[in-house]
């Protein structure tokens, strides 16, 4: 399956380069040390340019983590919402600056656009401030596993064939997030913890559960067809790391609600992390040890070990 051709408008292209250009200057923070060192870091569905993007939490992760390669797996910039009205607060600016600074300091940063930043797909093969733009990619882990990296919207029939319905669904999702924000403000005042209305609805609606299962199966099958041992994707805002019919299926989650990332340790171990800025360490939600591409299943997660290294962020 190949992406549909998209010709960005001049406004789209201007906003894309403008969003990257705002990070041209240093972000004003100098991190003496990074707490965690990873071989690879995957992030998706950040949705910069929206009010529900948790940019401050992401910035905290970027300050504490160093990786040799960072893959931005789509929907990094929310072009759909920016077309409706420009929203770009300082925290979103800081995230862009941090990414560009990492690229300048030698980190390989690869941007794989999704449907919300599809305007960038015509820039395939180009570099902006050291950030490489690709439609998809193949990553080879330390233990030799080939992972196909793609946002995932190519496998969403609504996005590909009924874009008006996709935009309607996005509007309903934004409305749900707004309700969720108000609800959790009230819960916080009453002393209750965070609760996700959108995740609750996804789990209760039969069609949503069926859609997620089909999406995951299709991605795993396509990765195998491409002679890869697994796939890393985003799009559905559902963090996951497991085996499907022998193939690794990894979904980075999002930075709207779940605050999750996929990482590869130096030995090829894959971990799905949930980042909590106030916590002493990220929560490891799932883990696949080296060699899992051929034999293993997800194991009980272990906490990542803090490794103080010179920060290249």
Region spans (language model):
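Core catalytic region of metal-dependent phosphoesterases/phosphodiesterases
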Residues: 2-20, 34-39, 50-142
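Active-site-proximal loop/helix segment associated with metal-binding centers of metalloenzymes
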Residues: 152-215
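Short active-site segment of divalent metal-dependent hydrolases/proteases
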Residues: 48, 77-78, 154, 238
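Binuclear metal-dependent phosphoesterase catalytic core
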Residues: 140-143, 239, 243-313
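Residue-level marker for buried hydrophobic side chains located in beta-strands
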Residues: 40-42, 70-72, 148, 232
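Non-catalytic terminal accessory segments
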Residues: 2-17, 133, 200-229, 239, ...
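Conserved beta-sheet core of the metallophosphoesterase superfamily
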Residues: 129-136, 148, 153, 157-167, ...
């Amino acid at each position: 399956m190949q992406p549909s051709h998209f010709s960005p408008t001049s406004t789209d292209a201007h906003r894309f380069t403008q969003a990257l250009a705002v990070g041209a200057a240093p972000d004003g923070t100098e991190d003496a040390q990074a707490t965690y060192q990873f071989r690879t870091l995957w992030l998706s569905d950040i949705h910069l340019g929206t009010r529900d993007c948790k940019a401050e939490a992401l910035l905290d992760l970027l300050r504490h983590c160093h990786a040799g390669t960072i893959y931005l797996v789509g929907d990094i910039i929310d072009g759909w919402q920016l077309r409706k009205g420009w929203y770009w607060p300082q925290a979103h600016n800081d995230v862009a600056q941090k990414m560009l600074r990492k690229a300048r300091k030698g980190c390989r940063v690869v941007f794989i656009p999704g449907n919300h930043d599809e305007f960038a797909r015509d820039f395939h093969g180009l570099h902006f401030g050291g950030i490489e733009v690709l439609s998809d990619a193949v990553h080879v882990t330390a233990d030799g596993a080939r992972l196909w990296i793609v946002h995932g919207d190519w496998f969403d029939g609504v996005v590909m064939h009924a874009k008006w319905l996709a935009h309607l669904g996005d509007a309903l999702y934004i409305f749900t997030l707004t309700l969720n924000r108000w609800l959790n403000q009230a819960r916080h005042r009453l002393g209750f913890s965070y609760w996700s209305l959108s995740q609750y609805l996804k789990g209760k609606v039969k069609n949503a559960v069926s859609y997620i299962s089909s999406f995951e199966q299709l991605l795993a099958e396509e990765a195998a067809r491409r002679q890869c041992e697994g796939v890393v994707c985003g799009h559905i805002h559902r963090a996951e790391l497991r085996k499907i019919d022998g193939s690794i299926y990894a979904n980075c989650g999002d930075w709207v609600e779940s605050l999750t990332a996929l990482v590869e340790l130096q030995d090829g171990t894959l971990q799905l992390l949930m980042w909590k800025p106030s916590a002493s360490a990220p929560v490891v939600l799932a883990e696949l040890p080296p060699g899992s591409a051929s034999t293993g299943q997800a194991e009980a997660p272990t906490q990542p070990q803090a490794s103080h290294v010179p920060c290249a962020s």
